[in-house]
């Protein structure tokens, strides 16, 4: 994972990079990562044997095996990419916190909230500075910025 922050729950990992937010199906991804590790080791072993082998039936067999393992590796890696439940563009790369089903992010003079289930943008607001600190308590979001400003945002109740 090349990114800035990660939040891990039993079922999902939420990843924040400079350009996007994403949610990963952890159990499926970890299963595929284990399979990939085994296949990579097998592929490296076959490559080593190929370097040592001379022309002949053994070399042909090794080439066929390496090709099969390579195809399996490609399938596993493609499956790993499909483990992302969602991925959305985001301009808030500096901080992240999860509160219930809401993922809050801080960025360059702004803060935003995304739904953890599907990544939909729920809310965003301007902030006075780079939002490096986020905290959630009692239905409120607290932000702290590079300018020393602390802001408090109160959750609005639907239907009120």
Predicted regions and their residues:
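Noncatalytic, solvent-exposed loop/strand surfaces
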Residues: 1-160
